[in-house]
């Protein structure tokens, strides 16, 4: 184990950079502010990467601020604990922040230094969230993420749509934060501790009483709000639709996934010792939530015409897939989820940048209004189309490697339906993006500007993000999209990625090793060698089915005769009615969303109380 102040530097660096931007604001030089922000993000990412390498080679690194180290297993101080998965997630945050800052080089003349400073604060909060070993600091970074995210969403407070999206974001995530805080308070009342390792050690071996179960339900519900798990997901599409493209890169690429990371970290360190005998019941609850999220997100994605909303619901669908991987409660599912999160985040970030390019050139993001307008953007069209197939798990993209690892872990536990679930969700989600690519970049399909109720608000949610002339696309806009897509491909091609992920996941779920490293400064015991078999023939067949199914469904929906949509067939009529009902649930009213969060919390906590005692 390595103990030093170095692991904290990645979080301190963005805060210092944001402060420097504030100090130089009087100079009024926008390019200087952007250069400082990019340099700061690069420095913090390099520091995170060093932390990651050190954690892989030498074991977990623990930093105790102010030198307040534990005595006799009692932790009073605040710590950062760097393990491979946490450091890897923080590094991924840094990479996406760099991409967002590069893309935003020509953004927001009117807000000056505010936008890059907020992005750096957002980055620092996400990195701190990934590295924190203290449950209350998790909450602090959770709230800081929300505050910075709200400010970034409402980048134009004089416009109604960004303000509404930020309001939905603020209200829903504030309730999520409140749930987490109450859950932490209950845990503190039971254990008198805030350090994750110490809480886990104190609960280990004891039967979970009502207080512990209620705290678990509240904490999981609160972080499910951030992750946008159904039915806590309603705020997300409104925020994505109105947030600027650079912010969407971070929202879709990593912010939602951080909510799932928190659930995994807190479960394995804090609750696994006391809930270990109820793993099967917990799997059932979490798998159900993951499957529902994957299918509803995919369905809503296919119903969208607003490209940002489409990708927002794609994010929700894949959050469901990630939750399924975590819900298996073993290192194999967690390793697959880690790979899947990185690869999918890179691809979705690339797709959002493509949408940003379209918004720059055409000032629109509705696929019907963009009909054929992307013909003069062939490179962007290629990236967008390949990205759509990558969402379907096309080999050799990293998303294929990640989902096949989860599927193998699920089959090993007898969950035969998980590969089918992933295939259906990927087909529907990818088909929506394929349909949009054909309509926008090839001009296929009917030129129909009318759409389902509630879908014609795309223009009022869209503003001109990039100032200046828009008759050409600067390389700084489209180049990050290509690089991110290639990075998503590289995740699946680099030798040994699955082996590193499996080893990191095995250390993540080794709660006794984590507790020993944090509370007693002892290196964790050597884990048995990781066995990695790689994707099987069945995995490739599922991937081929997903990719082919997405192409057929996407092109079929695009080329279906217009009169078929108005068919009097009972099947079509019922499908339209069901689609209208599902869309109607996403009303955009904060009161409705609060009601769903309340209902979801009651259902989840009730399920825990009934099955985990």
Regions found by a protein language model. Name each.
Residues 243, 374-380, 430-547, 565-603:
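Cytoplasmic/organellar membrane-interface segments at the starts of transmembrane helices
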Residues 500, 606-613:
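Juxtamembrane boundary at the C-terminal end of a transmembrane helix
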Residues 7-17, 33-47, 86-93, 115-122, ...:
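Hydrophobic alpha-helical transmembrane segments of polytopic
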Residues 11-21, 41-51, 90-101, 123-126, ...:
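Helical transmembrane-bundle signal
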Residues 77-93, 208-223, 419-426, 521-553, ...:
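Hydrophobic alpha-helical transmembrane segments
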Residues 53-61, 186-196, 264-272, 391-406, ...:
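Membrane-helix interface motif
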Residues 99-109, 113, 123-138, 148-461:
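Hydrophobic transmembrane alpha-helices and their helix-loop junctions in integral membrane proteins
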Residues 1-8, 16-119, 197-201, 555-559, ...:
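Transmembrane helix-loop-helix hairpins at membrane boundaries of multipass inner-membrane proteins
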């Amino acid at each position: 184990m390595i103990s030093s102040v170095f692991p904290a530097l990645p979080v301190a660096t963005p805060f210092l950079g944001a402060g420097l931007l504030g100090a130089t604001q009087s100079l009024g030089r926008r390019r200087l502010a952007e250069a400082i922000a990019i340099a700061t993000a690069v420095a913090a990412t390099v520091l995170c990467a060093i932390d990651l390498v050190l954690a892989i080679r030498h074991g977990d690194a623990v930093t105790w601020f102010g030198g307040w180290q534990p005595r006799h297993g009692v932790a009073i101080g605040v710590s950062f604990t760097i393990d491979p998965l946490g450091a890897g997630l923080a590094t991924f945050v840094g990479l996406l922040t760099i991409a967002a800052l590069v893309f935003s080089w020509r953004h927001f003349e009117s807000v000056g230094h505010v936008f890059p400073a907020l992005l750096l604060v957002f980055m620092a909060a996400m990195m701190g969230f990934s590295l924190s070993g203290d449950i209350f600091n998790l909450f602090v970074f959770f709230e800081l993420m929300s505050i910075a995210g709200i400010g970034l969403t409402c980048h134009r407070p004089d416009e109604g749509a960004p303000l509404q999206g930020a309001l939905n974001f603020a209200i829903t995530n504030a309730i999520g934060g409140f749930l987490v805080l109450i859950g932490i308070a209950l845990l503190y009342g039971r254990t008198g501790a805030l350090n994750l390792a110490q809480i886990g050690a104190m609960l280990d071996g004891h039967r979970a009483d009502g207080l512990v179960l209620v705290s678990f339900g509240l904490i999981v519900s609160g972080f499910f709000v951030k992750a946008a798990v159904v039915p806590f997901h309603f705020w997300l599409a409104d925020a994505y639709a109105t947030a600027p493209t650079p912010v969407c890169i971070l929202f879709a690429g990593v912010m939602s996934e951080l909510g799932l990371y928190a659930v995994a970290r807190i479960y394995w360190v804090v609750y696994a010792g006391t809930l270990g005998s109820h793993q099967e019941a917990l799997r059932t609850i979490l798998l159900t939530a993951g499957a529902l999220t994957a299918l509803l997100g995919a369905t809503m994605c296919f119903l969208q015409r607003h490209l940002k909303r489409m990708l927002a619901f794609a994010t929700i669908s894949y959050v469901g897939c990630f939750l399924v991987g975590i819900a298996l409660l073993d290192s194999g599912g967690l390793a697959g989820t880690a790979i899947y999160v990185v690869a999918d985040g890179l691809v979705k970030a690339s797709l959002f940048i493509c949408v940003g390019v379209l918004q720059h050139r055409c000032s629109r993001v509705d696929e019907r209004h963009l009909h054929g307008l992307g013909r003069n953007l062939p490179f962007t069209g290629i990236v967008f189309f390949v990205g759509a197939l990558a969402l379907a798990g096309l080999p050799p993209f990293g998303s294929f490697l990640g989902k096949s690892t989860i599927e193998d872990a699920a089959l090993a536990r007898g969950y035969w339906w998980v590969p089918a679930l992933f295939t259906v969700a990927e087909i529907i989600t990818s088909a929506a993006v394929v349909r949009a690519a054909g309509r926008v970049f090839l001009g296929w399909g009917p030129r129909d500007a009318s759409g389902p109720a509630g879908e014609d608000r795309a223009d009022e949610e869209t503003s001109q993000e990039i100032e200046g002339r828009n008759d050409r696309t600067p390389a700084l806009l489209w180049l990050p999209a290509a690089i991110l897509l290639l990075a998503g491909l590289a995740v699946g091609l680099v030798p040994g990625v699955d082996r590193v992920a499996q080893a990191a996941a095995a250390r993540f779920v080794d709660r006794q090793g984590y507790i020993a490293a944090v509370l007693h400064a002892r290196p964790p015991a050597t884990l048995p060698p990781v066995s990695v078999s790689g994707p099987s023939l069945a995995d490739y067949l599922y991937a081929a089915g997903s990719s082919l199914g997405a192409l057929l469904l996407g092109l079929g929906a695009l080329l279906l005769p217009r009169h078929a949509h108005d068919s009097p067939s009972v099947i079509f009529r019922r499908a339209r009615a069901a689609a209208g009902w599902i869309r109607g649930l996403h009303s955009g009213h904060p009161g409705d969303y609060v009601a769903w969060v309340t209902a979801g919390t009651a259902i989840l906590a009730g399920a825990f109380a009934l099955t985990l005692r």
